[in-house]
């Protein structure tokens, strides 16, 4: 079957498909696809592509000396074939050595000499093509042009300008090379100019000099050009600028433009510059419409700048210029071209064969363009199925696309020399029909319906037909055909047979065909029934081809099918093939003689039955033409060509065609046909007969053709003949010659020189002589020797050559043949200049001087002319020459054919002008000069002489430097001395002579770094981190200027080390200097050097000196501290030693600090042990106790840092005896035993054992009680029998000691007894507390509770908060502070009673600490504080909070409870901070302290008055000296500098973040006053400085000061004087008024500050008094001396005001003493209390405090709220500062009330205490007077003095005396001052003098106590000599000092008054002791007060403010009473300050 398909395809491919071929043959199950075959130029592979790599390449210009390489701008994938063509379409070829195309498509043109120039190669248009299977594209036209090297010169002309105006220099370039030349730079003398403020180089190459100055005329100006392609540079001549003084003149345009072309999107500058005075103004118009500035248009110094140009910007631009004296305008046209752009749409075209494709090409950038379409590189012309529509042929429409139409389509747009293109690839899919699915072969029975389907795909939609055994299906009732089109575009056809018959069997075929091809499918349908053969049609076969014969069998089944010919079974040869299964016979390569005949098909139906049918095959032979060709013919000849058909069946028809069409009769062609031949005859051949001739032969079998081309050759002939011509010398001439012929003839020119007999020679073509494409000869530059005969010869190898000659006559225009380019003349002498002219006569010669014709009337000029041969010689004489004659002279020669000129530069030489000398740079030992050469006398400068001398010397002793090179314009004078003044001048010399002396300069050299080191450098260590360095300045002659400061270099000294020095810079203070280095390493050896500094730098360093810082305490704790309990009383401790770098000295040992952590949360006594070893065993410890342990190292300087606490518990031991035992009978047989736990548990109590025994007999009973039980009932005892009872505690270590043995007897009438013990009960506040009272007895006793109130017990109040349980316990809920006190429980029955007393102590949160500032630095603040009352619970720690001023953000730090100071680091310099402190105890955090404020050291910057701001000033620069800025102790954060010309409003800003030593202001205006302002900031603030300065004139002179002169008339003098007087008086009055207002404001502010402090004190007083108020009896107070105490750092100021009398009535008394806060549980030593009552005379308004470290306007001691005071105080006296009250009112009555609650036992010693009394006002709603304590840890005398000064400023304290105590360190002072202090917290706050300074006596404020509790109050008394042993050391010494100074009587009185018991509670008040001044004893006697006595206190005269008073404590009384004797105190001295 496939063989049949191949045969069918072969037949169709040859175009021979007979009409009945398919209808007579059946092919079972055969699928055939028939394609119309066409040559394809486009692949269907979508991955193939073409593209451009440089589509913008349109022009290549190169130099003939370099050649060029031009790559083809197209490429593609897969790789493409690249070819180059000329614009005419001719493919180029290689020309050896001239042109070559590389394999990669690069076109190379080699370098060539001018004589080898060829237009076709070196100046032509090319294009290249790229071709691959995707198609073929062509590039845009590329114009390749070679530029020949041509000599040229450029020149610049002199210009004139007015000073302050503008000058424009232009570089004049010859027009022949102007397109290739670019101005690259300008030079001023030999220095290249750079565009700047005054010199601008425009885009066109012009030089603008703005703001012309006189010195601009002293230079020569030249332009430098470069050839764009050859790279050659040219330098123009020198031109000068003549500067004149400004004169009123109308504007004159100096620079403009005629026309300018630009591409859209570019930047264009339209120049317009004019000169005139006054300076003209400019205005631009476009198309006569004023121009409005916008973002694209901007008027600049040079003209109008247009950014991003658009085509709409094209137009006429007018630049109007005007001033007061006239106008001018410049008109130019701007052409903005839009780049050509072509765009094809759609971008992707994918279609099918036969479809329509439309392409559109849109063009931008032009309106009148030429558009053409190309397909695969070939131009597309309309016709057939191609249409090109649109106004500009922009639409391409192609119908019925064939496969060959696919490929690359391009749209080309051309306009002038621009072109653009775009391309798109058109992909054509294969639209040939394809069978997607179809029916299959099947067998059916008669009557069975059958449906056959064919699904076909193709483009365009195919047509489907059905056949049965090659016969069309006839539609009838049982045969129906239908078809549908699916969504995929497929055509589905159905053949439905409803009632199948046997005749319906056979081969069914569906055939689909469209314009792309035909496809068919066939399969056999067998219908059961008797087999038979359907009649077959005869077949015509073509000889030489294959033929298929199908046997049309119907019916099924059958046995076989066989073919016979002439009764012979086929096949019988190799060309015959029989397919038995489907009945098909194939005849290959049919032969007429053999294969023609009758063929029989025999079908075997049954074994013995067969049927047959015959078919006749006729074989026809197609024609065959014998090939023929046209020979070479020429025009006019005769032609005969035969066409012979050598084979083929007759009849044969023969026809002829020309170029595919029938031959028209008008051509005169004769055709003769005879049988199988045909001939073509032409009698007279002409060009019309050119073409392709085709002979076509046809018969019944086929039609064949043969084609041949006829080419008619034409001999050459002239179209334009040459004729004689004239040519002008130097101009171009074209010798015309044009010819035609075929092939195209070749034209050759020959030349014969002269007018004689011609002897023609070939002409060598070159760049000057070129052959044009039409054959004419072009001579670009006619020379005189070109005159002669020229012959034009034409040939093309057809016929004879033709030629024609002509004569060229060369006319010579006037030419200057000889003249001097340059010539020299000496000023004052005669000068002659000649020039020679040549050319056609007559010739006229004239002379010009710089465009001015020289006339005979000019007296100094004489012109003479003479003829010599064919030349004319003209001579110009100048008599005599002057400077102005220098310049350009020109001689002009003119005749009828042209003119010429020769330019002669005449230089008149003379001695030069002196140079203008200026300073370029001044250094310490050299001066750099720069000079501007004036007029050089038109003779090169041969050298310069420079003279220099000291200012004080004469020019006779000058140092001279001769013959400085003339190439230099600057020099440096060296070997000068720094900071010295010199005079300098110079001379210029040329060949003519020497100039005058230049201007004289006076210059002072800069300072140089000192040459000598500082002298006498000494080091003195003053602390562990400080070393004082002292030195003296270097020797005077080595200072090299003024010493501004020093640098100290220091480093850790190491003998072999190489450590770098740390540098510190300081300012100088004099010849002797001192500086202290701080923050050094402790106990470290340092090496130090000192260097002196001046403005120039740093001098040599001094010799290194070594010293060591002092020893200090260690900075780190010992490490790895470990502790282990070894026994119940010992702990073993070990640690590691410190590193050497942290010891800070010589290790003396280690100190171990330890204390017990008690069970109640309290801390035990702090102890310390020292050792020299890194281990220690602590013994004598409490058993089973948790210990805190810290270790520190100490040196000779003291203790170092403690280690972190570690905790270790000692081991368990047997417990101690129970602390107490009670036993009582509850009945006749039962007793109760109660006990207290042991005081020393020594472990965990496991149980208690109760022992009970009776002696007769001795029986001991043991009873066990649980460890948490403290009572036991012993039953079953004998009545009225005594028993011994004791108790033992038991731990894991065993039984402890037994308690005391008590006896008890069971009784029937048992009296009431309380088993609970008396004692102290401690509880936190706001908790519920149960006070137990367990009572026994028979009958059961009754219990009542009482509380001690003012010494009198009273029953407790029972309410909702207080109740008594049935067991006798007293319950207090939510216990408060006022619940503290002594409670009594009384139990009673009929037989007795018992009582216990419980002391309830309520723990509250701690009171607020008193926070002060003790030290500040620039980055840190050290705070100290005194803790307040601990609230009955030890302080557990502190929380310090801080915030920057004006900030809401607070930070916090936890602080150990043992600390009393804290240092905050890394703070901002010079900044205010706020601080608060909160204490915490076991109850919780206490009240926050008052907010205090402190400021770190540092202030805002300031400029030193001793420093000069301006270091140097010249014409355009100012150097500022910034060394004078002092940073104020804080680093500079910003530095802003602004300056502006005086009188203007715009500031020029230069901001710097750091200060350097100097700063230079550049580009200032010459001779102008400026305003300057600086702003320097640091973290503390900002400072500003303003100044004015003036720049110098260009000659170095100064300008007048800023003074406005007023010209006044005589009449106006008097009026002006009066006006001045009036203004002066007004100013004075305004000044006085302002001063008065300022004084009022200052006074008001001070008053407000005082009032604020008073208000703060008022608030504090209210707080204190609200806590301390207690009711008491009224006391009378005797007259006292007013005292005020001020706390200052470690100092006490006792402010004493005498002669103050007051009478005060006190009704409300507050009792505050040290004894109030002692241990209340210990009652062994009761003290007598002396209470002094004092009532404030007025409302308190504020405390008097030390504000030396506080911020102005703030009060560091302000308190806002009240809190419970402390319960324990240091025994040292606190110093209280009294507030300042209002003026006193009328006198009040004082009464005295003495209370002695408990007499002192005989022989007892009073407990030492201090007593204070603060009394509130009677009006409790108003603020109370209070006393405030402050403290600081600082001990400097400066702070003391500052506090003293603050106190003296207070009005009431101006006449006060101040007493202070100065402390010295002693070995025993620390121990003495801390003796007897048991409280851990207070021991840390004791004011022990640790170093020399001012003693500090401070303590916490007192805690308020119950008014009724006076058991522990102390009474001030005079100590007897025997009592001194009980006093602290300082009181002992003070008492001894006071003995003998009126002490006896007063001491006695005081002591008696205090100790004598009284029956009445009202006693006389003892005399108050007064302080005794150092200079004399007090003479005041004590007044005796009687009960009820009344005293009147007089008011102070004129007092504005009231008095303040402070009560004396016991210590103060002693201090007041002691005598001030010298030398007795071992560590203190006292002073009195007045």
From Swiss-Prot:
Membrane topology, as annotated, equals: Single-pass type I membrane protein
The record's CDD domains line, in alphabetical order, gives: FN3, Ig, Ig_DSCAM, IgI_5_Dscam
The regions listed as transmembrane in this protein's record are 1622-1642
- The UniProt record lists the Ig-like C2-type domain at 39-145, 151-242, 251-321, 339-427, 433-526, 530-618, 622-711, 716-809, 813-909, 1311-1403
State the PROSITE patterns in the record: FN3, IG_LIKE
Q: Which GO terms describe its biological process?
A: axon guidance; camera-type eye photoreceptor cell differentiation; dendrite morphogenesis; dendrite self-avoidance; dendritic spine development; homophilic cell adhesion via plasma membrane adhesion molecules; locomotory behavior; negative regulation of cell adhesion
Those parts of the protein on the Cytoplasmic side are 1643-2034
Q: Could you cite one Gene Ontology molecular function of this protein? A: protein tyrosine kinase binding
- Signal sequence interval, chain numbering: 1-18
> Which cellular compartments is it found in?
Cell membrane; Cell projection, Axon; Synapse
Disulfide-linked positions: 72-128, 171-223, 272-319, 361-411, 454-510, 551-601, 643-695, 737-792, 835-891, 1333-1385
Tissue and organ expression note: SDK1, SDK2, DSCAM and DSCAML1 are expressed in non-overlapping subsets of interneurons and retinal ganglion cells (RGCs) that form synapses in distinct inner plexiform layer (IPL) sublaminae.
Q: What residue spans carry the Polar residues bias annotation?
A: 1882-1891
Q: Which residues are glycosylated?
A: 54, 104, 496, 513, 538, 582, 684, 692, 736, 774, 821, 950, 1168, 1186, 1276, 1297, 1367, 1514
Q: Which residues form a coiled coil?
A: none
Cellular component, GO annotation: dendrite; growth cone; neuronal cell body; plasma membrane; synapse
- Record's keyword terms, sorted: Cell adhesion, Cell membrane, Cell projection, Disulfide bond, Glycoprotein, Immunoglobulin domain, Membrane, Neurogenesis, Phosphoprotein, Repeat, Signal, Synapse, Transmembrane, Transmembrane helix
**SUPFAM superfamilies cross-referenced by the UniProt entry:** Fibronectin type III, Immunoglobulin
Query: Is Glycoprotein a UniProt keyword of this protein?
Result: yes
Q: How does it assemble?
A: Homodimer; mediates homophilic interactions to promote cell adhesion.
- Functional description taken from the UniProt entry: Cell adhesion molecule that plays a role in neuronal self-avoidance. Promotes repulsion between specific neuronal processes of either the same cell or the same subtype of cells. Mediates within retinal amacrine and ganglion cell subtypes both isoneuronal self-avoidance for creating an orderly dendritic arborization and heteroneuronal self-avoidance to maintain the mosaic spacing between amacrine and ganglion cell bodies. Receptor for netrin required for axon guidance independently of and in collaboration with the receptor DCC.
Q: Which PANTHER family match?
A: CONTACTIN, PROTEIN SIDEKICK
Protein's name according to its UniProt entry:
Cell adhesion molecule DSCAM
Query: According to the entry, what is the taxonomic lineage of the organism?
Result: Eukaryota, Metazoa, Chordata, Craniata, Vertebrata
């Amino acid at each position: 079957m496939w063989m049949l398909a191949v045969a069918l395809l072969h037949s169709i491919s040859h175009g021979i498909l007979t009409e009945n071929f398919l209808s007579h043959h059946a092919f079972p199950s055969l699928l055939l696809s028939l394609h119309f075959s066409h040559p394809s130029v486009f692949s269907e592979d979508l991955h193939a592509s073409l593209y451009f790599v440089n589509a913008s390449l349109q022009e290549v210009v190169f130099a003939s000396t370099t050649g060029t390489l031009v790559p083809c701008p197209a490429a593609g994938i897969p790789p493409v074939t690249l070819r180059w063509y000329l614009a005419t379409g001719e493919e180029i070829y290689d020309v050896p050595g001239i042109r070559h195309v590389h394999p990669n498509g690069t076109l190379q043109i080699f370098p060539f000499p001018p004589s080898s120039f060829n237009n076709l190669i070196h100046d032509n248009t090319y294009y290249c093509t790229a071709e691959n299977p995707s198609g073929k594209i062509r590039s845009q036209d590329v114009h390749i042009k070679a530029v020949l090297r041509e000599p040229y010169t450029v020149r610049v002309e002199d210009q004139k300008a007015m000073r302050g105006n503008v000058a424009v220099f232009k570089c004049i370039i010859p027009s022949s090379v102007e397109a290739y030349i670019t101005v690259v730079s300008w030079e001023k003398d030999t220095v290249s100019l750079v565009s700047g403020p005054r010199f601008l180089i425009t885009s066109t190459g012009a030089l603008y000099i703005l703001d012309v100055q006189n010195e601009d005329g002293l230079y020569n100006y030249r332009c430098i050009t470069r050839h764009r392609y050859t790279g050659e540079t040219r330098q123009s001549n020198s031109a000068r600028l003549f500067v004149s003084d400004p004169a009123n003149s109308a504007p004159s345009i100096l620079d403009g433009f005629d026309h300018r072309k630009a591409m859209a999107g570019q930047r264009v500058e339209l120049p317009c510059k004019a000169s005139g005075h006054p300076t003209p103004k400019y205005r631009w118009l476009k198309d006569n419409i004023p121009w409005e500035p916008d973002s694209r248009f901007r008027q600049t110094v040079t003209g109008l700048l247009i950014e991003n140009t658009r085509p709409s910007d094209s137009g006429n631009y007018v630049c109007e210029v005007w001033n007061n004296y006239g106008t001018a305008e410049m008109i130019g046209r701007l052409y903005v071209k839009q780049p050509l752009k072509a765009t094809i749409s759609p971008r992707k075209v994918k279609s099918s064969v036969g479809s329509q494709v439309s392409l559109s090409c849109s063009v931008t950038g032009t309106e009148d363009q030429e558009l053409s379409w190309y397909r695969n590189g070939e131009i597309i012309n309309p016709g057939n199925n191609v249409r090109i529509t649109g106004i500009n042929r922009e639409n391409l429409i192609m119908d019925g696309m064939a496969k060959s139409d696919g490929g690359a389509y391009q749209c080309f747009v051309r306009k002038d020399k621009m072109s653009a293109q775009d391309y798109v690839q058109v992909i054509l899919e294969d639209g040939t029909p394809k069978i997607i699915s179809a029916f299959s072969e099947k067998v059916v029975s008669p009557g069975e319906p059958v449906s056959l389907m064919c699904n076909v795909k193709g483009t365009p939609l195919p047509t489907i037909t059905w056949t049965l055994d090659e016969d069309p299906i006839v539609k009838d009732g049982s045969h129906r055909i239908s078809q549908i089109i699916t969504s995929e575009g497929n055509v589905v056809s159905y053949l439905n047979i409803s009632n199948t018959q046997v005749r319906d069997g056979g081969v069914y075929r569906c055939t689909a065909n469209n314009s792309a091809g035909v496809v068919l499918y066939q399969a056999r349908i067998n219908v059961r029934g008797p087999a038979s053969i359907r009649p077959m049609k005869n077949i015509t076969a073509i000889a030489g081809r294959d033929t298929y014969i199908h046997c049309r069998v119907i019916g099924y089944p059958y046995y076989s099918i066989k073919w016979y010919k002439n009764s012979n079974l086929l096949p019988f040869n190799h060309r015959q093939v029989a397919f038995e299964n489907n009945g098909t016979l194939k005849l290959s390569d049919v032969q007429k003689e053999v294969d023609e005949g009758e063929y029989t098909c025999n079908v075997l139906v049954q074994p013995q039955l067969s049927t047959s049918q015959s078919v006749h095959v006729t074989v026809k032979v197609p024609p065959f033409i014998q090939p023929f060709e046209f020979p070479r013919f020429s025009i006019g000849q005769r032609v005969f060509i035969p066409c012979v058909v050598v084979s083929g069946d007759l009849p044969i028809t023969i026809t002829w065609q020309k170029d595919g069409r029938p031959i028209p009769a008008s051509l005169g062609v004769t055709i003769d046909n005879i049988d199988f031949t045909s001939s073509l005859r032409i009698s007279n051949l002409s060009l019309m007969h050119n073409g392709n001739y085709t002979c076509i032969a046809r018969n019944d079998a086929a039609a064949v053709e043969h084609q041949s081309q006829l080419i008619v050759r034409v001999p050459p002939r002239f179209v334009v003949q040459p004729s004689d011509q004239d040519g002008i010398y130097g101009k171009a001439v074209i010798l015309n010659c044009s010819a035609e012929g075929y092939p195209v003839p070749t034209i050759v020119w020959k030349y014969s020189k002269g007018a004689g007999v011609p002897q023609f020679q070939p002409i060598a073509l070159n760049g000057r002589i070129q052959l044009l494409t039409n054959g004419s000869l072009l001579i670009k530059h006619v020379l005189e020797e070109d005159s002669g005969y020229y012959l034009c010869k034409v040939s093309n190898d057809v016929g004879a050559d033709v030629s024609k000659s002509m004569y060229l006559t060369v006319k010579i225009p006037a030419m200057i043949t000889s003249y001097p380019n340059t010539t020299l003349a000496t000023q004052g002498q005669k000068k002659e200049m000649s020039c020679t002219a040549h050319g056609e006569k007559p010739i006229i010669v004239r002379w010009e001087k710089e465009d001015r014709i020289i006339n005979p009337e000019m007296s100094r000029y004489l012109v003479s002319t003479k003829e010599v041969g064919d030349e004319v010689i003209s001579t110009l004489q100048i008599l005599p020459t002057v400077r102005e004659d220098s310049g350009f002279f020109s001689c002009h020669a003119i005749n009828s054919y042209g003119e010429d000129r020769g330019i002669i530069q005449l230089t008149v030489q003379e001695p030069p002008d002196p140079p203008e000398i200026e300073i370029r740079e001044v250094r310490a030992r050299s001066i750099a000069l720069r000079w501007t050469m004036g007029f050089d006398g038109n003779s090169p400068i041969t050298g310069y002489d420079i003279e220099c001398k000291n200012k004080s010397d004469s020019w006779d002793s000058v140092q001279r430097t001769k013959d400085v090179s003339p190439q230099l314009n600057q020099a440096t004078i060296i070997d000068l001395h720094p900071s010295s003044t010199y005079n300098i001048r110079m001379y210029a010399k040329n060949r003519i002579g020497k100039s005058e002396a230049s201007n004289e300069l006076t210059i002072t050299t800069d300072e140089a770094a000192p040459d000598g080191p500082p002298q006498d450098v000494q080091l003195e260590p003053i602390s562990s981190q400080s070393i004082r360095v002292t030195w003296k300045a270097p020797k005077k002659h080595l200072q090299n200027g003024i010493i501004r400061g020093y640098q100290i270099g220091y480093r850790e000294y190491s003998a072999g080390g190489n450590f770098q020095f740390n540098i510190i810079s300081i300012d100088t203070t004099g010849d002797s200097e001192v500086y202290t280095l701080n923050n050094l390493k402790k106990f470290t050896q340092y090496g130090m050097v000192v260097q002196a500094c001046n403005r120039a730098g740093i001098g040599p360093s001094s010799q290194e000196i070594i010293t060591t810082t002092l020893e200090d305490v260690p900075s780190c704790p010992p490490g790895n501290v470990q502790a282990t309990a070894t026994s119940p009383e010992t702990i073993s401790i070990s640690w590691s030693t410190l590193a050497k770098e942290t010891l800070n000295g010589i290790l003396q040992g280690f100190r171990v600090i330890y204390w017990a952590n008690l069970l109640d949360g309290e801390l035990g006594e702090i102890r310390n042990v020292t050792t020299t070893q890194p281990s220690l065993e602590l013994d004598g410890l409490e058993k089973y106790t948790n210990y805190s342990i810290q270790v520190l190292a100490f040196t000779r300087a003291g203790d170092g840092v403690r280690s972190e606490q570690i905790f270790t518990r000692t081991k368990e031991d047997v417990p101690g005896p129970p602390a107490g035992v009670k036993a009582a009978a509850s009945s006749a047989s039962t007793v109760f035993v109660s006990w207290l736990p042991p005081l020393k548990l020594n472990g965990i109590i496991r149980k208690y054992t109760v022992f009970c025994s009776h002696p007769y007999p001795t029986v001991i009973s043991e009873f066990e009680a649980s460890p948490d039980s403290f009572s036991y009932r012993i039953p079953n005892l004998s009545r009225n029998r005594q028993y011994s009872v004791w108790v033992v505690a038991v731990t894991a270590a065993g039984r402890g000691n037994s308690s005391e043995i008590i006896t008890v007897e069971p009784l029937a009438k048992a009296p009431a007894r309380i088993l609970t013990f008396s004692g102290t009960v401690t509880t936190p506040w706001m908790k519920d507390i149960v006070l137990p009272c367990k009572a026994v007895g028979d009958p059961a006793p009754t219990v009542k509770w009482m509380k001690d109130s003012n010494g009198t017990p009273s029953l407790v109040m029972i309410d909702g908060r207080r109740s008594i349980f049935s067991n006798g316990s007293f319950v207090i809920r939510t216990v408060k502070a006022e619940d503290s006190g002594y409670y009594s429980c009384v139990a009673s029955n009929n037989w007795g009673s018992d009582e216990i007393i419980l002391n309830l102590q309520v723990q509250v949160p701690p009171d607020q600490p008193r926070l002060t500032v003790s030290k500040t630095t620039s980055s840190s603040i050290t705070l100290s504080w005194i803790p307040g009352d601990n609230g009955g619970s030890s302080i557990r720690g502190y929380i310090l909070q801080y915030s920057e001023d004006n900030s809401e953000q607070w930070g916090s730090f936890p602080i150990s409870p043992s600390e009393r100071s804290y240092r905050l680091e890394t703070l901002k310099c010079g900044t205010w901070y706020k601080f608060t402190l909160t204490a915490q105890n076991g109850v919780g955090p206490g009240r926050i302290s008052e907010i205090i404020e402190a400021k770190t050291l540092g202030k805002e910057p300031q400029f030193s008055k001793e420093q000069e701001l301006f270091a140097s000033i010249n014409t355009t620069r100012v150097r500022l000296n910034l060394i004078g800025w002092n940073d104020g102790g804080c680093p500079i954060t910003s530095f802003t500098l602004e300056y502006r010309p005086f009188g203007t409003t715009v500031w020029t800003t230069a901001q710097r973040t750091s200060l350097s030593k100097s700063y230079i202001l550049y580009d200032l205006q010459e001779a102008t006053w400026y305003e300057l302002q600086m702003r320097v900031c640091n973290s503390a603030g900002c400072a500003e400085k303003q100044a004015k300065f003036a720049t110098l004139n260009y000659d170095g002179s100064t300008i007048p000061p800023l003074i406005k002169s007023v010209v006044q008339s005589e009449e106006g003098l008097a009026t002006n004087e009066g006006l001045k007087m009036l203004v002066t008086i007004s100013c004075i009055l305004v000044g006085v008024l302002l001063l008065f207002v300022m004084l009022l404001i200052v006074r008001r502010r001070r008053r407000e500050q005082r009032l604020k402090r008073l208000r703060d004190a008022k608030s504090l007083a209210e707080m204190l008094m609200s806590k301390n108020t207690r009711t008491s009896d009224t006391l009378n107070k005797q007259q006292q001396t007013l005292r005020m105490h001020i706390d200052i750092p470690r100092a006490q100021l006792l402010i004493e005001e005498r002669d103050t009398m007051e009478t005060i009535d006190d009704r409300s008394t507050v009792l505050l003493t040290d004894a109030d806060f002692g241990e209340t549980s210990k009652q062994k030593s009761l003290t007598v209390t002396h209470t002094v009552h004092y009532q404030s005379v007025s409302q308190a308004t504020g405390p008097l405090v030390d504000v030396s470290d506080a911020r102005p306007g703030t009060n560091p001691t302000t308190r806002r709220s009240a809190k419970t005071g402390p319960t324990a105080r240091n025994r040292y006296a606190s110093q209280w500062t009294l507030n300042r009250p209002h003026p006193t009112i009328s006198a009040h009555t004082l009464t005295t009330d003495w209370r002695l609650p408990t007499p002192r036992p005989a022989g007892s010693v009073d407990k030492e205490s201090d007593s204070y009394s603060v009394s509130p006002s009677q009006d409790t709603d108003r603020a109370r007077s209070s006393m405030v304590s402050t403290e600081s840890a600082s001990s400097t005398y400066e702070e003391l003095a500052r506090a003293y000064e603050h106190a003296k400023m207070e009005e009431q304290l101006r006449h006060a005396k101040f007493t202070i105590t100065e402390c010295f360190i002693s070995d025993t002072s620390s121990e003495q001052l801390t003796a007897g202090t048991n409280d851990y917290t207070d021991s840390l706050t004791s004011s022990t003098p640790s170093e020399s300074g001012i003693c500090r006596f401070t303590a916490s404020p007192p805690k308020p106590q119950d008014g009724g509790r006076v058991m522990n109050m102390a009474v001030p008394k005079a100590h007897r000599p025997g009592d001194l042993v009980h006093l602290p050391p300082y009181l002992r010494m003070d008492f001894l000092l006071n003995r003998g100074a009126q002490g006896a009587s007063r001491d006695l009185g005081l002591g008696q008054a205090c100790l004598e018991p009284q029956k009445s509670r009202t006693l006389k008040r003892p005399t108050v002791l007064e302080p005794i001044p150092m200079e004399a004893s007090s003479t005041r006697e004590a007044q005796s007060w009687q009960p009820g006595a009344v005293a009147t206190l007089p008011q102070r005269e004129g007092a504005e403010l009231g008095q303040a008073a402070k009560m004396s404590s016991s210590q103060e009384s002693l201090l007041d009473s002691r005598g001030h004797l010298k030398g007795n105190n071992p560590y203190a001295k006292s002073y009195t300050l007045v």
